[in-house]
Amino acid sequence: MNTDEGINPLDLAREVEDLGIESIFLPDHSHVPVRRSAVYGGPRGIFPDSPGDMPREYYRNRDQLVTLAAMGAVTSTLKLGTGVCVVVQRDPIQLAKELASIDEMSSGRLLFGVGAGAPWNIEEMSNHGTDVRTRTALMRERIEAIRTIWTAEQAEFHGTHVDFDPIFSWPKPSRTPHPPILMGGDGPTVLDRVLAHADGWMPGHLDETFDGLEDRIVELRERATACGRDPIEVTIYLGRITHIEEYIRMGADRVVFTLPTGPVEETRMFLATVADLARQTV
């Protein structure tokens, strides 16, 4: 996460691009409720290294889209990713314009990672008026509404959760037909959502095992071929440097590592390590 206690985001973007790293992804948390009913990571303990309260970075991360726009303004090749955008907490009409503006101003460098939020983060969603029980259906409709706004001169959408009559909305994204949509998540039906609503899958690697992840990558690509889809891009999120060979063997197209918040020199050392790793695996 990029916070007000770490490296300046514009310096970070320039250095990442200068090192030849392909992309940068930013998370999306608008706030942290003071009172929360669930433990960070949820009952399954999906973040075993950070039990209990949320890490400090969650409280201090900058706005995702504002920061990506600023990063795009000081770079020319760096891809700008939402990792992920919690679309159930954002108005779809406004979000479509914000994302299209970033893509248009950056000459087509946006990667739109999407997610429905986690149930352990229920209070944050509730403060935005989102019902955690219907968040996945809401996410699906908002993705399709955004896609419609991006691709239609007069866009309209009529669903259960999103409903609007014809509208004009510019700019349109620079990328045609639109920026790649990367579906986050690891649940039992996520592959269905990838095939129905996205161009790629963005699973998190949350433990030390690989069998389940590898099997699902194979399944996803077999299903994509069977239904005539183009190859599905796989971006491993929350990747671990020590496992890079396994990610390559499984056929991952991209690995996103978590940049620790710390002194600037430590950040630069971490970036140099990632850049060296990227050069070795090309």
Where are these regions (language model features)?
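Active-site-adjacent structural elements that line small-molecule/cofactor binding pockets in enzymes
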Residues: 1-282
